[in-house]
Amino acid sequence: MRVKRNLAGIKKDGERPDLVEYRRRQILQAAKKVFSEKGYHQTNIADIARELKIGHGTFYRYFKNKREIFESVVGEIIKRVSTVVSGEDPGATNSLDEYIRQVRRLGEKLFALFVEDPTIARMLFYESWGLDEEMREKVWQMMGTFGRYTELYLVNGKKKGFLREDLETEATALAINTLIFESGRRIAKSGDREKEKKTWMNTVINLMFHGIKKQE
């Protein structure tokens, strides 16, 4: 399915800043789709131009090259995920029940990204990692930032007494995030993403708070 809008007739000079941003986002939207379908190395500017029904020259007024477009696409994805991850106050919960509800809210919002836009998973977990060391480092830094943010929730639970005193918060936070991102990858690849989301949502919650031992 092609992006419906096109950029035909763009003026060369005197564009309003809001129009420049709008057109950049159009290019990024189309580029994300093409990169996720063909991969970075198999994609060229002509493929993205074809998706938008524009000439090659238009691109070079907004982006220097394919690499810059790719980095911008990944940057936008990281912003979207970051907005969800930072959408709750780590210190707001005062009991285990409140924390479980908070985790479920965050999980629902985060997993919804992968349901609504499976290209996010493709870009983050495949194309970015496979590009080069510089891009892998950017994604690695993102993972580290999310890990530190997740740790704040665990520190709050220890401080207020509803999580174990001996909990290794840093390692546990990274383990939780690994599970969450693997869930997102699986959701995005599923033929029934809504069903897969529910399965992984319940699995993550149960594993975090009840473990795998038989309940007495």
Mark where each language-model region is.
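Amphipathic, non-transmembrane alpha-helical scaffold segments
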Residues: V20, L28, F70, V74, ...
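C-terminal peripheral helix-coil segments that are non-catalytic and often amphipathic
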Residues: M1-K11, R105-A112, E116, R148, ...
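Hydrophobic alpha-helical connector segments
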Residues: S72, G87-E116, A173-I176, K198
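Short coil/turn segments at alpha/beta junctions that flank glycine-rich nucleotide-binding fingerprints
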Residues: E37-H41, D117, K160
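Amphipathic alpha-helical segments used for helix-helix packing
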Residues: L113-E134, R185, K189
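Helix-turn-helix
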Residues: E15, Q26, A30, V34-E68, ...
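Short, hydrophobic secondary-structure boundary micro-motifs
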Residues: R122-L124, E165-D166, E196
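Amphipathic alpha-helical packing segments from all-alpha helical-bundle domains
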Residues: K79-S82, S86, E133-K160, E170-L174
